[in-house]
Amino acid sequence: MSAQLDKEYPTFRHLFEVPTLKSLNISSDTNESIYLCGNSLGLMPKSTRKAINDELDTWAQQGVEGHFSHPERTPWVDIDLPLLPLMAPIVGAKESEVAVMGSLTSNLNAMLMSFYKPKGKRTKILFEKHAFPSDYYAFLNIVQLFGYDESHLIQVAVQDGATYLRTEDIIFEIENNAEELALVCFPGIQYYTGQFFDIKSITKAAQDHGICVGWDLAHAVGNVPLNLHDWNVDFAVWCSYKYLNSGPGAMAGIFVHQRHTENNSKTSYNPRLAGWWGNNAQERFQMKEEFNPINSALSYRQSNPSVIDTVAVKASLKVFQEANGIQFLREKSIKMTQFLQDLLTQSQYYINQNEKPTKLGFQILTPLDPNQRGCQLSLLFHPHYDEKSKNIMEQVNKYLHNRGIVCDERRPDVIRVAPTPLYNTFAEIEYAVKSLNEALNQIEN
């Protein structure tokens, strides 16, 4: 069946460098690994190396003149601007609503400084329990900067016996705490469970009460289609090294709805962490002691972008363009993850989400509804230890790795498996599940 599906759904694997068993120090075999870890770090597009080397050559040959007089490509002073029409459709935004800048948490902190506006009783931030720690630190830091403590952070927890949050529970907490909320901020996709939140409904529920809404889209961008402008999201932040395949620690991105920037002027603009690269480009090098923000999300930039980082992001975004865009890839992604789910639920070691674990096996933490997830399935292994006091999850992951299957482990007991439509195949998924069953069988016997 996997062979037929691979014929129906093309792969763009040829555009990527895929680690081999030899390069991963697994064996001397030069065959490519099965890389199911794009949710942690995407593979390198083959075009990235040339894109970076070209700019290194320009630096060597032009020096400072590369800023304004590039021999072949965009001068460095505008190096990030060609990325806007490539990034905007991936997040469902207007070009004026996106900027490629900074890193994920630095951008989140910048957005919080601008959009967290405590006033009167409205001082609190609502977000998920067990959020990615960096987000928690940012939320705690911003309330402390305004003189509050952690009691001004409201966390929505999963109900007892459930593995992920329900939209109605989030909306209930918004409505129940509306008079005290200054900000609601959730992830588009939960990093641990892989749950895809209902961004449109949650945003509307909060804004109906006059509450600002932001989103951390680290695991959503390049994974699922987004419509940030139409959903009326106030702001969003994301990284680009996961599904966008821009490289470890690569430059990140922001979305700011046009209603917050289109009327920017010297005397009227949203307070922010400002810098000269957010200033009107025509006045930037006049060195005036006057901030005249650009009428777009670019006004949130602080410093000139790293050229090397920027061209790496551009190379990765061009891959999405060549692959016919995120909507096209989503169709294949839904099919792949459903194929993975079907194989897993057929395993003798599968334990239903609502079942109390009493045997060796795994549960799927991720919603089984394709519309409530991206490409990732998170597998929770039981029990924690075997009879020899060895961690089950770690044994399974080691078995998979020794067979050239790269997944992401989250201690103590979870393996995240993320078949990525750009470069993974159905045959790889089939082999990975077969190997997982073999690993558990070996532990059992």
UniProtKB/Swiss-Prot annotation:
It is found in: Cytoplasm. One of its GO terms (cellular component) is cytoplasm. NCBIfam families: kynureninase. It catalyses: L-kynurenine + H2O = anthranilate + L-alanine + H(+); 3-hydroxy-L-kynurenine + H2O = 3-hydroxyanthranilate + L-alanine + H(+). The lineage of its organism: Eukaryota, Fungi, Dikarya, Ascomycota, Saccharomycotina. Belongs to the kynureninase family. Pathway: Amino-acid degradation; L-kynurenine degradation; L-alanine and anthranilate from L-kynurenine: step 1/1; Cofactor biosynthesis; NAD(+) biosynthesis; quinolinate from L-kynurenine: step 2/3. Catalyzes the cleavage of L-kynurenine (L-Kyn) and L-3-hydroxykynurenine (L-3OHKyn) into anthranilic acid (AA) and 3-hydroxyanthranilic acid (3-OHAA), respectively. GO terms for biological process: 'de novo' NAD biosynthetic process from L-tryptophan; anthranilate metabolic process; L-kynurenine catabolic process; L-tryptophan catabolic process to kynurenine; quinolinate biosynthetic process. Pfam families: KYNU_C. This is Kynureninase.
